[in-house]
Every structure is written in structure tokens, then in C-alpha cells.
Amino acid sequence: VLPIYQGSQRQRWLVGTGLFLYDHLAGKSILPPAQWLTAETLLQRDPQLKAEGLLGGYAFSDGQMDDRRLALWVADQARLAGAKLHEHSDVIAIDTHGHVHIADSSYLHDRVINVGGPWAVTLLKQSGIPSPYRLDTVRGSHLVLERECPQAYLLEVPEERRIFFVLPWQGKTLVGTTEVRQQAHEPIECSVAERDYLLAAYNHYTTAPLSAANINSTFAGMRPLLYSAADPRKATREYALDRQGQLINVFGGKWTTALALAHKVQQQLL
């Protein structure tokens, strides 16, 4: 649900138009279309939702995933298909002739695919291979709160244009996310500042505020922002492919486009 309050940065007509287009451009779907819910209905669903200034909200459908479990499943599928996995093996260097150098040995392959994610350009740099792209890395942190979540929400951060999510998660409440620039070599973990930022945003919309003592756990992930050498001012969260000899580099990407990206990489292998 996306609640609309008096003074919200996104007005009802704008959100409604966007969700109408979202529903109709998506084509056939097993999911119900977006609908407007009154303030009374929202408060019946969640009595702890902030009532002051609440006009109502739009209910819409979306998906939820466990990225860690999905990644492990993909690895298992690769193993079942005959792939040999080397876990906890640091790649020291690669080259454009098919060599992969790890700590204690080297391998020669017909093709090498660099899917280092946020570290793809770092691997090229330490291998002495020029990159046509630059990656900046952005950390997104999350809180898992010791409270059941009766309703999933998409909410505005107070005094900002940013949005954040409050979602049911394994019997608890998941709150996220932040957007903080960081270096690829830095620890990927939720900072105290991010913790306080998310708690304050969450507490703005509840009549039963929580404190740091109510946090079950925190976690963070790192997203690559892709910059082209041709236009270093423009960033994107999409992906790009680059081929140099026997080496195929994948820059950027995200889970929602992973399958389409995999098909394009497969075409490069033919």
C-alpha cells in the first residue's frame, strides 16, 4: 500500500495515473489491479498506522524475493548442469586469452566471463586490462524489526523525495533501503547513521515507535552504478557487455534483468 497524506510529495492523482499505466502496460497478469483504499480501511488493517492527515492509499501488487536463497539455487542448478564451482577462491587476475589466475593455480578456458558485479572493473584494473566503463558502488542497508508487519508499505521519507519500504519478512518487519556511496573494498554493513535514518523514517508513520533495542538484525547489499566512458556524467542501473578477445565483461545489472542479461551473454559465447 502507498498511503497518501496531506502534504505528500506525490499527490493522489499522480500516483493513481502511474499505477493505472503500470497495470495496463504490464499486460495480462494474475495479480489484482491497483485500487484506492480509504483511510478507514487502512486503519482497520493496521491500527498502528499514523492516522493524522491520512487521506487513504493505493493498494497494488508486487513481488518479493530472498536474493540469498535465489543465488544459492542458481549455483545449485549450475552444479547440476555440470559446472564446477570453486568457492572461497580469490581471483587474482584474468586476461583476454582465457586465463584465470587464482591464489594457488591458473586455468585456461575457451571463454572467460567477468561477472564480478561491483568488483568487475576492480578485477580488470588489477589485471591490467582497460575498461570502457566505470562503476560507482552504492550501499543499501536494511533493518529487521522485532514486530509483525500487518501490511506492506511503500512510504515517502519525511522531507525527502526518496521512498522506502516496510514489508512482512519471516514473521518480522523489514525496513529499507538506504542509498550511500561507498568504495568496493569497504565493509558492506549497515552503519549507525543508516540505522537511525531508517528507524526515524519508520517511526514517522507509526503510533508505536521502536528503538534500536527492537532491531533483530541488519544487513546491507552493494549495487553498481554504471558510467560510460563516452558520457561519464550519466549513471544507470542497467547493464552493458564488452568483449575483448576471449574475455566477456558484464558491467552493472540487477536481479530483475538477470535472465535477459544471461541470454545476451549466452549469445556472445556462440
Predicted regions and their residues:
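Helical element adjacent to the flavin cofactor pocket in flavoenzyme catalytic cores
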Residues: Y58-H101, S106-R111, A258-A262, Q266
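Dinucleotide-binding Rossmann-like beta1-alpha1 core, especially the glycine-rich loop
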Residues: V1-R45, F164
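C-terminal catalytic lobe of FAD-dependent flavoproteins
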Residues: R69, Q77, T122, P130-L174, ...
